[in-house]
Amino acid sequence: MTTPSLQTTIEAAWESREGVTLETRGAVRDAVEAVLDGLDAGIYRVAEKIGETWVVHQWLKMAVLLSFRLNDMTPVSGAPGGATWWDKVPSKFAGWGEDRFRAAGFRAVPGAIVRRSAHIAPGVVLMPSFVNLGARVESGAMIDTWATVGSCAQIGRNVHLSGGAGIGGVLEPLQAGPVIIEDNCFIGARSEVAEGVLVETGAVLSMGVFIGASTRVIDRETGEVFMGRVPAYSVVVPGSLPGKPLPDGTPGPGLACAVIVKRVDERTRSKVSINDLLRDTPR
């Protein structure tokens, strides 16, 4: 099928998805399988930047969701001690041998789990980590130990996801956009970016920064407030906002936020170490 015919078939199946079952055969199953293979190979991507705007291809998410209706639970080999897992989604690496890994050109150490339909580009390093279905990890990225890349998330070139960092996934609600981490970003250990937040090129998040769609990202120098995105080449640390007084007049609880402590240009970002960028400067 051509891409337009795939899209038409998937969208029609989605409108009548209650009729899509384990017994469904023919064009619908073939279209879903073609999309999963295309996502896995990097031919398709759930979100792409067109000009200066990120565009989400919802029909590809529809295909991923339809696959859950089409595929039954089945044993998945490879669990510790010779045990098996029980799932609808096979490993990306199922059936791979040395030649396939060499051709793929990335490194996957023991404990790295990648589900089918996630795309891993050449030059990526996967430490013991988890990459969910429909996600895309671009060349040169490091997915460090216990980091997670959620469903359909987009990880740019040379991104470093530090130990235990979490990038939220999104399949439902359908209209929600995926988390996007643009090229050359650094996400500190145990930080979490979720709910469709866009982290723009070259941004640095320190350890323990939590950003969702409603989190206020405040530029300390200008007072400007961002929600849903982190501006390019921002250096961001955890912060808090004073809470409103309680009804009895006593101070209320503070609210978490993220604070932009400085901004750097591309040249500085490429030359200065992450530790130096995160070291606060006297006001």
Swiss-Prot record:
Protein's cellular compartments: Cytoplasm
GO molecular function: 2,3,4,5-tetrahydropyridine-2,6-dicarboxylate N-succinyltransferase activity; nucleotidyltransferase activity
Keyword Iron belongs to the record: no
Top-level taxon of the source organism: Bacteria
Record key words, sorted: Acyltransferase, Amino-acid biosynthesis, Cytoplasm, Diaminopimelate biosynthesis, Lysine biosynthesis, Repeat, Transferase
SUPFAM superfamilies the record matches: Trimeric LpxA-like enzymes
Location, primary (coarse class): cytoplasm
EC number: 2.3.1.117
Residue positions binding substrate: 107, 144
GO terms under cellular component: cytoplasm
Annotated catalysed reactions: (S)-2,3,4,5-tetrahydrodipicolinate + succinyl-CoA + H2O = (S)-2-succinylamino-6-oxoheptanedioate + CoA
NCBIfam families reported for this sequence: dapD (TIGR00965), PRK11830.1 (NF008808)
Name of the featured protein: 2,3,4,5-tetrahydropyridine-2,6-dicarboxylate N-succinyltransferase
Family: Belongs to the transferase hexapeptide repeat family.
GO biological process, one term: diaminopimelate biosynthetic process
